[in-house]
């Protein structure tokens, strides 16, 4: 059954319920009014952007979870996560032994050397006692339940093929480190964590989708140390100074090959800067919704190429903060040669986007990773279900 058919069924079901249970308006006249939840269900079922259209609106999603791996777009396209492995169900929210985690815990599953598609038995809040080190070929899939990870963040270091989907990560602290399980072997000594919700270092084929990220000690997502082929999509970033860092230092020349996509995300509720902040690499920032910022929205140094396409930039009211961009680390003349381009972007409330450089000639790899941009006027709709969402077995998401 396709998306349209599922939506029609849901629509007529909700309409029938409304007919049987009419409510009254403030004026006292009998009136059929859809609830907020009904409106959100219809909106979600519609699956508005290219990633969600790949899998949402299908009632059999629970029995075909691994089809999600075919839906990655941008530079993480082809990331399969744990598609070729077993489905592993997390049954416990405990994290009481980080060196030798018990079977049934998220830490045990994440450390395995084999591919796994990790799901959750029920709603749970996982209070991590140390950073969670995720091994290669894993999908962490929170669909069907509400999964929150707090206190500690996720670390993806020198790994490949990771999908993180529909997880709420918040209130992440710097943790002291120690002996931590990171693979099938003995635990290894880890230094203190940085306090990011998701830290990606030296890794490739990483897809972060439909996550809600907020309140961390440092940043929300850091991608550094030669990481590449990364897509951050359909996420909601809130209540944090620093959102996304793509390249950590102007001396890290290994990031010259970084390819990253930032697509269909919502930045709102007191996010100050780094949406993203880029160094060296090649970045497509496409169809995101920027609902004000503090210092700036998108920044960079070390001559990154940043292609902004079809975004909606709603500037803050402060007249000195209207600039979308921040160029740092060099003189004005040099930075104005960097290829920072704008196409189809919507600038609102006096937002200013000062382009520089020229339209680059794309390599075949760069061309293959580009997501077709819709006009900025569509960004609000395309990001309307960003972040985690409710999804029930037997019904379309």
Curated annotation (Swiss-Prot):
SMART domains: Amb_all (SM00656). GO terms for biological process: pectin catabolic process. This is Pectate lyase 2. Its cofactor is Ca(2+). It catalyses: Eliminative cleavage of (1->4)-alpha-D-galacturonan to give oligosaccharides with 4-deoxy-alpha-D-galact-4-enuronosyl groups at their non-reducing ends. The N-terminus is blocked. One of its GO terms (molecular function) is pectate lyase activity. Binds 1 Ca(2+) ion. Pollen and flowers. Pfam families: Pectate_lyase_4. Belongs to the polysaccharide lyase 1 family. Amb a subfamily. Its EC number is 4.2.2.2. Glycans are attached at residue 37. Pathway: Glycan metabolism; pectin degradation; 2-dehydro-3-deoxy-D-gluconate from pectin: step 2/5. PANTHER family: PECTATE LYASE (PTHR31683:SF159), PECTATE LYASE 18-RELATED (PTHR31683). It comes from Ambrosia artemisiifolia (Common ragweed). Residues 1-25 form the signal peptide. Has pectate lyase activity. Monomer.
């Amino acid at each position: 059954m396709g998306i349209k058919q599922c939506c029609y069924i849901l629509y007529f079901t909700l309409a029938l319920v409304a007919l049987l249970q009419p409510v009254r308006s403030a004026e006292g006249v009998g009136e059929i009014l859809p609830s907020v939840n009904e409106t959100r269900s219809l909106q979600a079922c519609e699956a508005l952007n290219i990633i969600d259209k790949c899998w949402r609106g299908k009632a059999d999603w629970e029995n075909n979870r691994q089809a999600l791996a075919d839906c990655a777009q941008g530079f993480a396209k082809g990331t399969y996560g744990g598609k070729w492995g077993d489905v592993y169900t997390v049954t416990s929210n405990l994290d009481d032994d980080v060196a030798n985690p018990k079977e049934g815990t998220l830490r045990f599953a994440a450390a395995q050397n084999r591919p796994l598609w990790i799901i959750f038995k029920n709603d749970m809040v996982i209070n991590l006692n140390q950073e969670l080190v995720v091994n290669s070929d894993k999908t962490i899939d929170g669909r069907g339940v509400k999964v929150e990870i707090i206190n500690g963040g996720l670390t993806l270091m020198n790994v490949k093929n990771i999908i993180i989907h529909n997880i709420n990560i918040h209130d992440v602290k710097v943790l002291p480190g120690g002996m931590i399980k990171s693979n099938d072997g003995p635990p290894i000594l880890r230094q203190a964590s940085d306090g990011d919700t998701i830290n990606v270092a030296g890794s490739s084929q990483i897809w972060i989708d439909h996550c809600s990220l907020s309140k961390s000690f440092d940043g929300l997502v850091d991608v550094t140390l030669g990481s590449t082929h990364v897509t951050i999509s359909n996420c909601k970033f809130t209540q944090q100074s620093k959102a996304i860092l793509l390249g950590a230092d102007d001396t890290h020349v290994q990031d010259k090959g970084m390819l990253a996509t930032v697509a269909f995300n919502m930045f709102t509720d007191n996010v100050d800067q780094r949406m993203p902040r880029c160094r060296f690499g090649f970045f497509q920032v496409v169809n995101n919704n920027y609902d004000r910022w503090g210092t700036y929205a998108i920044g960079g140094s070390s001559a990154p190429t940043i292609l902004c396409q079809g975004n909606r930039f709603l500037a803050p009211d402060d007249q000195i903060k209207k600039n979308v961009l921040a160029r740092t680390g060099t003189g004005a003349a040099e930075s104005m040669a960097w290829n920072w381009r704008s196409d189809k972007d919507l600038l609102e409330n006096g937002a200013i986007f000062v382009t520089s450089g020229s339209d680059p000639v794309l390599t075949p790899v760069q061309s293959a990773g580009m997501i077709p941009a819709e006009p900025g006027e569509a960004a609000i709709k395309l990001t309307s279900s960003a972040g985690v969402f409710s999804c029930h077995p037997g019904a379309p998401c």
